Amino acid sequence: MTTTVKRRARIGIMGGTFDPIHNGHLVAGSEVADRFDLDLVVYVPTGQPWQKANKKVSPAEDRYLMTVIATASNPRFMVSRVDIDRGGDTYTIDTLQDLSKQYPDAQLYFITGADALAQIVTWRDWEKTFELAHFVGVTRPGYELDGNIIPEMHQDRVSLVDIPAMAISSTDCRERSSEERPVWYLVPDGVVQYIAKRQLYRPEGSDKDMDPKGQNQA
């Protein structure tokens, strides 16, 4: 009689400001899920990103709702409020500790941009994060992570995945929206409508209503 051993669940964790979430984030989640045979990808909007303490960031609820809208059509995607509800500055170590408690039997894969991964030694309790997850750096084709950045003892816990759509950036999407230039096909359709409805990313002092139909113009 053959005994089937059930493998541990594999869960991707993608943390980010998502201001706004764009198609590059979604393609990255899908590609990493396929590459590592993930059962689920959890998108985690930050509460207060510590790296952006002096920068203007959209309200957490707006960023959360845009992420929910963007991921709703993919049954392998879900959104967690764990960082928002915790309050205070968001640190990856806290995210991973909280989610490892929610999924105690799962193998976690933390998905982040390779440029952010290159700064990992500046993160709070960064060495402990390797005990909780395998790190996946998503990047544009041709990018190479400096081998000296990640200590040798942790290099087997890091993988890079090329994502062509990572050329899209949230910064560019915000700038285009503030100038009333189209962001269709850069962010999901529902997010385009949400940005227009909530009048996000308008210039300071602007009292001009954004025209959601204008986002249709090429």
Swiss-Prot record:
It holds the Pfam family CTP_transf_like. GO terms for biological process: NAD biosynthetic process. It catalyses: nicotinate beta-D-ribonucleotide + ATP + H(+) = deamido-NAD(+) + diphosphate. Belongs to the NadD family. InterPro entries: Cyt_trans-like, NadD/NMNAT, Rossmann-like_a/b/a_fold. Its EC number is 2.7.7.18. This is Probable nicotinate-nucleotide adenylyltransferase. The keyword tRNA processing does not apply. Pathway: Cofactor biosynthesis; NAD(+) biosynthesis; deamido-NAD(+) from nicotinate D-ribonucleotide: step 1/1. GO terms for molecular function: ATP binding; nicotinate-nucleotide adenylyltransferase activity. Keywords: ATP-binding, NAD, Nucleotide-binding, Nucleotidyltransferase, Pyridine nucleotide biosynthesis, Transferase. Disulfide bonds: none annotated. Catalyzes the reversible adenylation of nicotinate mononucleotide (NaMN) to nicotinic acid adenine dinucleotide (NaAD).
